[in-house]
Structure formats: structure tokens, C-alpha cells
Amino acid sequence: MPKSSSRGADSGLRELPARRIVAAIGDAAARWTDADYPPRVRATAAIVQRTGYTEPVVDYALDRLFGEVTSASLTAAIEGEIGSLRALDGFVARDGRPDAFARGIDGVAIVASDTTIGVALPAVVFALCAKCDVDVRDRSDALLAAFADTLTQERPELGAAVRVHAGIAPEHPRWRAALRDAGVVVAFGGDDALRALRSEAAPDARFVGFGHRTSATYVARESLENDAHARSLAAGTAVDALLYDGDGCLSSHVVFVERGGDVSFERFSHLLEEACAAVAVEFPRGSSAPAGAVLAYRDGARFRAAQGAGGVAWGEGGSYLLVIEPPRHEAPPLLARCLAVYGVDGVEEFTDFVASHAVPLEAVAVADPAAFPDIVAAIAASGAARVARIGALQSPLLAAEHGGVGRITPFVRWVTRDA
């Protein structure tokens, strides 16, 4: 079994009922929904400096991040996965099965990603709900360290159970020791980083890795019922694509639009261009200039358009790049603020494209996830872990699984008791 840590016993977290832990975490997060809360003000400035994102983008991200962390959403996720909060406190009866206790694993190590704001926060709060000791390697903006201070103010036991290593190097002895002692390792990053972390972890540690993935948008012809609705879908698609400069697994980089709707593919492409221009004003690009790869992709699209193949729209100052009908044999452009748009006759073209380019999908946004069962089935078969609503791609629900993995289940082990 993985090595145990004594910090959990010292923190007193295991003696707290899960419902009190959940309530305290929800109360702490509620403070962070106030844009004028001093720790949030300081964190916002640090995130802007680290990521280069503009302040409106960071504020949008923090509103949605902490707005989701409520006692209701935490409870819904936990009860949906393990049956009840009480299962985290001790043995509970189960119909037709032995009594069981979902005991939190003592040591958890969590590694945040370089880009997505607060991506490790849900893992941290659910590990605490499971009464685990938590070591987290955070980015230099120290967002999680600041939130841990707020948790301490709510319940000192929470602060005693979490230790944040902000900006620490992966090879630092203190971090390597925490990684070796962890019974669970949760990590966000690229393939090489995940392999390195896995090799450093204990051989029998539970490893939950979230690699680099991307998202897409699919617009069914039935959704293009009139110009007003098409305009709304275009606006949502633009937000999904441009919000975080195309960073993170939930940024859409590819849009598939079915032909044959009341609003034509060409008209929707024009509406999408207008929407990108508007979103680029509301959420301006970060401080970095367009990368060379973006400029090269733009120039290639311009050359093809001059020959009568496809189209291209380039926002002022490189605020967005919209490429219409790029060659299907080319891999999709997973580039900052870059969106490729394809006209299709049916969902089979989407699945063929994804399969031929081995696109690692995290989510696909559609107009109405409940309205198109054939499309949703194809999305599920493509490897995507989530079917989102257009315009809400960047706002995942805390009560839902992430990356196809449960929220609380990675941090518990079941202990059964015979009758």
C-alpha cells in the first residue's frame, strides 16, 4: 500500500463530519466570488502577470471557478458517486451489499497545469472532502495558496491538511518527497510531464493524469432555423474559442457546420466572423503577439483563398484567425485564437475527421445536448468526455465528472464490513 502521512491525523480533518467540511469549503469559495475580496484582487494581478491574459478574462475565469464551488454542487457530486456524504465518515448500509466506508487516502499530490486558471482547484477541494492530506504544486501566481489561507479562516483543520508548493521546481527535494509518499497523484500536463511524474510516484500509487486535449463545436442544420438563432450560436462559439486565447482543453479550435439549414453555411461563417470581432473587444487577446505558427497558417489560408479555395478572416492586431474550409487532410490548427470552420453534410464527416487526425477531444459543444441523439452518440464514440452547450464550453459543472473521471472517487478506497 502507498505510504501514509501523519499530517491528516494532526490536522483533525478526519474527526470532522463531511457535511461540515463541505459547508466550510463552500463558504470559503463564496468569499472568492467577490471581485473586491483582497486576496482575489492580489491573485488576479498575479495571474495576469503569469499568463499574459487581460484582467477581464481573469475575472471571468475566477467568477466561474469559485461560483461553481458551492456546498450544493460538492454534495451532489459526492452523493452521485458514492451514495452519501456519510460514507466519508464511516460505514453505511447498502442494499444487497456489505456495509462500506469510503475512506480517504492519506496522501494526495496534485500538479497544476501551466495554462488553465485554477484547474487543480476542484481536485484539491474534493480531496479535502475525502479528508485527505494534500500537497499541491501550484503555479507562481499562488492562487491555491491564497485560497488555502481562506480555507484556514473557515476551518483550521482544512488549512492544516493542505500544503501548497507555489512555483516550486519539480526536482525540489521537498516536492519529490511529497510525490513519493502520495497514495494518489493527480496531474495536468503534456505526455512527457505525465510520464516523468508517473516515474517519480510510488509504484502502487493511484495515478490520474489529464493530458493535453482540445475541444470542438458541432452545429446541426436543425439549429440554423433562423438568423437570430444562428447569430446567438455564432456568439457562443466565438466565446468558446477565444476566451482564454485558445489555451486549455475546453477551448474550441474546430467548428463543423451542417449544410442544408435555413441559414446557410456561408451565412453562418459570416456571422461567426462578426461574433469573433465582438468577442475580441470584450475579451482582448493577452500580452503576447501572434505566434509564428499562427501567421504561417494565416498566410497559407490567404493564399488558398486567393485561388478561390476557402476563406480567411484576420482580426485587428491578430485578435482572432478564422479559416473557412481548410484542407481536410491537414490536422486542425490547435493555435492561439485560431478557429477552423468546416461545412459538412452529416456527423459522419466529423467522426471521420477526428479519427483520421487522432484528435484528442475533451468536449464537443452543440446547440442543445438533449436534442440530437445521433450527434451526441457520435460525439461519445469519438472519445470526448463531455457534450456541452454552445457558449458554455468553458463553464464545466463541478457536479459533473472531469475528463471522464469522477470527482471524489480518485481520493477514496472502499472498506467493506461483513455482516
Located regions from the model:
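N-terminal Rossmann-like NAD(P)+-binding subdomain of aldehyde/semialdehyde dehydrogenases
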Residues: 1-105, 364
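Well-ordered, non-membrane alpha-helical segments in soluble/globular domains
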Residues: 2, 227-238, 265-274
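Conserved small-residue-rich beta-alpha loop and adjacent elements
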Residues: 86-154
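Donor nucleotide-activated moiety binding/catalytic core segment of transferases
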Residues: 93-109, 168-179, 320-336
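Structural motif
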Residues: 112-113, 187-191, 220-222, 257-260, ...
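Short, charged/polar "capping" segments at the starts of alpha-helices
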Residues: 145, 194, 369-376
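Conserved NAD(P)+-binding/catalytic subdomain of aldehyde/semialdehyde dehydrogenases
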Residues: 155-259, 397-419
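NAD(P)-dependent aldehyde/semialdehyde dehydrogenase
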Residues: 244-252, 256-362, 373-417
